[in-house]
Swiss-Prot record:
<feature type="topological domain" description="Cytoplasmic">
    <location>
        <begin position="385"/>
        <end position="400"/>
    </location>
</feature>
<dbReference type="InterPro" id="IPR020846">
    <property type="entry name" value="MFS_dom"/>
</dbReference>
<keyword id="KW-1133">Transmembrane helix</keyword>
<feature type="transmembrane region" description="Helical">
    <location>
        <begin position="109"/>
        <end position="129"/>
    </location>
</feature>
<feature type="transmembrane region" description="Helical">
    <location>
        <begin position="429"/>
        <end position="449"/>
    </location>
</feature>
<dbReference type="InterPro" id="IPR050930">
    <property type="entry name" value="MFS_Vesicular_Transporter"/>
</dbReference>
<comment type="function">
    <text>Involved in acetylcholine transport into synaptic vesicles.</text>
</comment>
<feature type="region of interest" description="Disordered">
    <location>
        <begin position="485"/>
        <end position="511"/>
    </location>
</feature>
<feature type="transmembrane region" description="Helical">
    <location>
        <begin position="37"/>
        <end position="57"/>
    </location>
</feature>
<feature type="transmembrane region" description="Helical">
    <location>
        <begin position="364"/>
        <end position="384"/>
    </location>
</feature>
<feature type="transmembrane region" description="Helical">
    <location>
        <begin position="136"/>
        <end position="156"/>
    </location>
</feature>
<feature type="transmembrane region" description="Helical">
    <location>
        <begin position="401"/>
        <end position="421"/>
    </location>
</feature>
<feature type="topological domain" description="Cytoplasmic">
    <location>
        <begin position="247"/>
        <end position="267"/>
    </location>
</feature>
<feature type="transmembrane region" description="Helical">
    <location>
        <begin position="166"/>
        <end position="186"/>
    </location>
</feature>
<dbReference type="GO" id="GO:0007268">
    <property type="term" value="P:chemical synaptic transmission"/>
</dbReference>
<feature type="topological domain" description="Lumenal, vesicle">
    <location>
        <begin position="289"/>
        <end position="306"/>
    </location>
</feature>
<feature type="transmembrane region" description="Helical">
    <location>
        <begin position="268"/>
        <end position="288"/>
    </location>
</feature>
Length: 511
């Protein structure tokens, strides 16, 4: 009797849980709600990637000093015989400071390894994303980042830390590119797309700026492995949430997917090249200042450890303000995205030039805040422009174009940790900042080249020029039919029939 009641109760609970799961699944698969959840997943992935990138800033220098700057040497101690001769000798091992361990070079290479591998991987990951979609690469990226973070937590040698850092670069090439491309794909209306990309940029900024104090506090009070385990746990949860929303390895119902434009064609597009150059240029000051500003603060203003630790934290708020202002302006005046980017470059240039003039911590906060405000203007204005350019000039598949954007960022962050210290040593901190500021100001007029982009419409003549090969898929076949239709004097009905015939043929072929 009791067993039967227990079974009945378990059956009711199981059916209730199943019904609840169906409701949750149905609610999550509602199109507008689903894209919001996907935006949250992408933002968490961006947050994790940038936190992992910056969390090692207060941890690695101190940790490397303990594991790399000492070497094991053996000292031979002679023992005298009774007649004064050396009969025996004993050896003992001691730790001696290693004069050949160049910590600055080691740290610079470790920091740059992530961006270098990301830079090398992006051409391939962009093409892969164009072929398979956005969800599988995002899941691959989160998986690689999870294992990279775990390796960081328990790695105890420079070689293992270097491998973990490089592995993170590969994960970022998948996760960052597919995440941004997914946002561009889900949010097709320009104002919504700009807003969604702005939210993602806010999470990127928050991750970069909050990670150093987060890592420093946990490292000091809980040990090296704790901050990395926290990040790996969040990464695991983000991957599980992604699997709940999408089914990346389920059988694909869409047989005829659009074929993305090869990345080499996008790279030689003059408009995309101008945008990519602006993204690299605006991030150079940040990438070159991060490894050099702490030493300069210590020498110039005798800054304390906590001041050097929170140098970039106040800049988070003007960065968010810059994102918000650009989103609002883009919604009201969408034709001036190029102008917002140009203003941002000028602000970055002026801020970079004024940093060496600061003589105390309070003064330094002002140009750093202005610098991040300008970066927010450039990024928020130009990232949606890349998707718009692909929409009007190519096929609306965004993996390769955002791989180019990721390459632009990676160039700056690959060169910064390696070159910045040497430039400061050879030329000086003042000359470094003046050079970076001048480059940004001189690049700003180049964005005038983009002033007519928003008036562009997809045109058959432009497609004729850009599409050099014959039709390879449904989209290009229809485009070819439309071209023929445009050439015929009374081709409206026949053109429509031809397109329908193409659709019928494609459907019959897929069956």
């Amino acid at each position: 009797m009791a067993v039967g009641q227990a079974k009945a109760a378990m059956g009711k609970i199981s059916s209730a849980i199943g019904e609840r799961s169906k409701r949750i699944s149905g609610a999550m698969n509602e199109p507008r709600r689903k894209r919001k959840i996907l935006l949250v997943i992408v933002c968490i992935a961006m947050l994790l990637d940038n936190m992992l990138y910056m969390v090692i800033v207060p941890i690695i220098p101190n940790y490397l000093e303990t594991i790399r700057t000492y070497k094991l040497v053996y000292i031979t101690t002679p023992s005298n015989g009774t007649n004064g001769s050396l009969l025996n000798s004993t050896q003992r091992a001691v730790l001696e400071r290693n004069p050949n361990a160049n910590e600055d070079i080691q740290i610079g290479v470790l920091f740059a390894s992530k961006a270098i591998l990301q830079l090398l991987s992006n051409p391939f990951t962009g093409t892969f994303i164009d072929r398979v979609g956005y969800d599988i690469p995002l899941l691959i990226g989160l998986t690689i980042m999870f294992f990279s973070t775990i390796t960081f937590a328990f790695g105890e040698s420079y070689a293992i830390l270097f491998a973990a850092r490089s592995l993170q670069g590969l994960g970022s090439a998948f996760a960052d590119t597919s995440g941004i491309a997914m946002i561009a794909d889900k949010y097709t209306e320009e104002s919504e797309r700009t807003q969604a990309l702005g939210i993602a940029l806010a999470f990127i900024s928050f991750g970069s700026l909050v990670a150093p104090p987060f890592g420093g506090v946990l490292y000091q009070f809980a040990g090296k492995w704790v901050p990395f385990l926290v990040l790996s746990f969040v990464c695991l949860l983000d991957g599980i949430l992604l699997l709940m929303v999408v089914t990346p390895f389920a059988s694909r119902t869409r047989v005829n997917t659009l074929q993305g434009t090869p990345i080499y064609k996008l790279m030689i597009d003059p408009y995309i090249a101008v945008v990519a150059g602006a993204l690299t240029t605006c991030n150079i000051p940040l990438a070159f200042l991060e490894p050099t500003i702490s030493n300069w603060m210590k020498k110039t203003m005798n800054a304390s450890e906590w001041q050097m630790g929170i140098t970039w934290l106040p800049a988070f708020f003007p960065h968010i303000l810059g994102v918000y202002i650009t989103v609002k302006l883009a919604a009201k005046y969408p034709n001036y995205q190029w102008l917002y980017g140009a203003v941002g470059l000028v602000i970055i240039g002026a801020s970079s030039c004024t940093i060496p003039a600061c003589r105390n911590f309070e003064e330094l906060i002002i140009p750093l805040c202005a610098l991040c405000f300008g970066i927010a203007l450039v990024d928020t204005a130009l990232l949606p422009t890349l998707a718009f350019l692909v929409d009007i000039r190519y096929v609306s598949v965004y993996g390769s174009v955002y791989a180019i954007a990721d390459i632009s960022y990676s160039v700056a962050y690959a060169l910064g940790p390696i070159m910045a210290g040497q430039i400061v040593h050879d030329l000086g901190f003042v000359q470094l900042n003046l050079g970076m500021g001048l480059v940004n100001i001189l690049y700003a007029p180049g964005l005038l080249f983009l002033r007519n982009v928003c008036q562009m419409k997809p045109s058959l003549s432009e497609r004729n020029i850009l599409l050099e090969e014959g039709p390879k898929g449904l989209y290009d076949t229809i485009i070819m039919e439309e071209r023929k239709e445009a050439k015929e004097p009374h081709g409206t009905s026949s053109g429509n029939h031809s397109v329908h015939a193409v659709l019928s043929d494609q459907e019959g072929y897929s069956e």
